[in-house]
Regions:
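Bacterial Sec-dependent N-terminal signal peptides
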Residues: 1-21
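Glycoside hydrolase catalytic-domain context in secreted enzymes
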Residues: 19-223
């Protein structure tokens, strides 16, 4: 009898806890349901705050709902040293140290997906240690002009090579609980006037040259 009562009490306790757990905090629920439930609980101000930065590399959370801030860091070839809250100056922390990895141009030149996996794993470990939620990388824009000062951040002019190399990087990075943010958007292939230029190209060029690496990053890498 006592064993039955103990089991019944435990069952009731578990049921009570389950009933009290909001859908958005229940890992067993579909992600769509969790997002919908979380949004339904937020004020307009809280929703707006989630859509833009609160500092150079962080977005606000919703403390009353237990939703934490989101902390990001550059970049494709190493976690960035900490910078000030509202400007690009370095914070000069005395305990701040990171590894400067070879640029992604060098990684792509190996033609070695296993090396890319090790690269992503190592960066992911450092990002997790630094308590980052999102790493802004890898960079997979295709080389269009040699005058792009950020070409070194990308994986070359071959869409197939970039597609193959970015996937293991992302997979291993994200095993550390750090999300990959692939950059810098498809067709953002030059720095000069990058926020203003009008990109003209055919669908064939888009799908055969500039989009494959981004597609592989999302569909195969899970970014």
């Amino acid at each position: 009898k006592n064993k039955f009562l103990a089991t019944l009490s435990l069952t009731c306790s578990i049921s009570t806890v389950s009933a009290q757990t909001p859908v958005y905090m229940d890992d067993a629920q579909p992600i769509e349901a969790r997002v919908k439930d979380a949004l339904s609980r937020m004020t307009l101000e809280e929703k707006v705050a989630l859509c833009h930065a609160q500092s150079k590399f962080s977005s606000a959370g919703v403390p009353r709902l237990g939703i934490p801030e989101l902390w990001m860091s550059d970049g494709p070839h190493g976690v960035r040293a900490e910078i000030n809250w509202n400007d690009w100056g370095y914070a000069n922390w005395t305990n701040d140290s990171i590894t400067a990895f070879p640029a992604l141009t060098c990684l792509a030149a190996t033609w070695n997906p296993d090396m890319s996996a090790k690269y992503g794993k190592a960066i992911g470990e450092e990002a997790r240690y630094r308590e980052k939620d999102v790493l802004l990388g890898p960079g997979v824009n295709i080389y269009r002009t040699p005058m792009n000062g950020r070409n070194f951040e990308y994986m070359g002019e071959d869409p197939y090579l970039a597609s193959v190399m970015c996937v293991p990087y992302i997979q291993e990075l994200q095993k550390n609980g750090v999300a990959a943010c692939v950059k810098h958007y498809a067709l953002n292939n030059q720095e000069l006037w990058r926020g203003h230029i009008d990109v003209n190209l055919s669908d064939r060029v888009l799908y055969e040259i500039y989009l494959p690496a981004f597609k592989a990053a999302v569909e195969e890498g899970g970014a």
